[in-house]
Amino acid sequence: GEDFPVEENIYQHCVRLMKSYKGKQDRARDKAYKTFMSQNSDSDDKVAIIDATGVLDSAYTGLVAIKLSEALNKPVLLVRKVDDGFAGSGRSFDYCPIEDFRAMTESCPETVFAQGHPSAYGVELKDINKAREWFNEKLKDVSFEKVYTVDFIVDAEDVSIAWCQELDKYKSTFAHGVDEPLW
């Protein structure tokens, strides 16, 4: 074999590998997202239950499911065929009117299990068509307009530069659970 000169240290090598992996992940996510959006963007179903069998690597299911949920403005169950049913990931979008989508999924008679967080969890269903019917009936009166909880409303004419600068002092505290102020 030939000797190749080492032109990067271990840190540079790790960064290069991680960027390569992230690029591969992004390409797989985006390809699947486009496929599923074209199949589901006109659906009137209250929950998008999407069969990803043969289309998406299971490692990317959660990434694609949350992107679909945000774009479709409805909860998503992105699953693939397994031995006795379908398994995958459940996701609901920020400000979804269903506060605990996992618990609702767990109460569906077609659910084998739903485990994880209220809006991001693993799921297994027996029959996706029966589950789709159940969700449509259960959520028939629910509007999926985003719901924003507010502490107070400020009229535009009452906003000053000093007030904005005061809020800006707290920007490092905004995170999940402590939302940035909406304007």
Residue ranges and their predicted role:
Residues 141-183:
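A contiguous loop/helix-start segment that scaffolds small-molecule binding in enzyme catalytic cores
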Residues 1-133, 137-139, 153-158:
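Hydrophobic helix-and-loop "lid/oligomerization" segment in the mid-to-C-terminal part
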